[in-house]
């Protein structure tokens, strides 16, 4: 893994109501370069946006990288570093033999991580962490902008 570009990625998701309009925010740093990504959906959940943020960041990369990825989502971090191994062994079922929630995004995140070396970090949200606060703002603004895009993987309980 020597010679890989070293990136810092910060991610956050937001949802106005849960479910409701949602958004994701990403700050990517490589040397002196900073890139921001964000997007919104008409109806989604907070957890889906927390998963979509790192997916969008990783899918934007054009080559394998060494990454420190920081999020305030324990759900996303624990899922990708711990729970996913059991889910995959059980054919995407939980230990209780229930289908994994948000499986479409977990599978996408799993695929997006495959070519990178990633150190997953957690930071407390709303605690003054500059990049996390910026991601929070990007995600919230995307959710508040009246997004019309449909989160096709979101299934409303009906």
Swiss-Prot record:
Catalytic activity: Endonucleolytic cleavage to 5'-phosphomonoester
Cofactor(s) needed by this chain: Mg(2+)
Pfam family, one: RNase_H
Cofactor comment: Binds 1 Mg(2+) ion per subunit. May bind a second metal ion at a regulatory site, or after substrate binding.
Subunit structure: Monomer.
Similarity-based family: Belongs to the RNase H family.
The name this protein goes by in its record: Ribonuclease H
């Amino acid at each position: 893994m020597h010679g890989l570009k070293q990136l810092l990625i910060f991610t956050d998701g937001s949802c106005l109501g849960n479910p409701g309009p949602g958004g994701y925010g990403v700050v990517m740093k490589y040397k002196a370069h900073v890139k921001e990504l964000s997007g919104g959906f008409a109806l989604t959940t907070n957890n889906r946006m927390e998963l979509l943020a790192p997916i969008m960041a990783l899918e934007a990369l054009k080559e394998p990288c060494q990454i420190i990825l920081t999020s305030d989502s324990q759900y996303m971090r624990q899922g990708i570093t711990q729970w996913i191994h059991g889910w995959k062994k059980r054919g995407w079922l939980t230990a209780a033999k229930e289908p994994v929630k948000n499986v479409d995004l977990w599978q996408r995140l799993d695929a997006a991580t495959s070519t990178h070396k990633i150190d997953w970090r957690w930071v407390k949200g709303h605690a003054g962490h500059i990049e996390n606060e910026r991601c929070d703002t990007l995600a919230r603004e995307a959710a508040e902008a009246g997004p019309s895009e449909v989160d096709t993987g979101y299934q409303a309980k009906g």
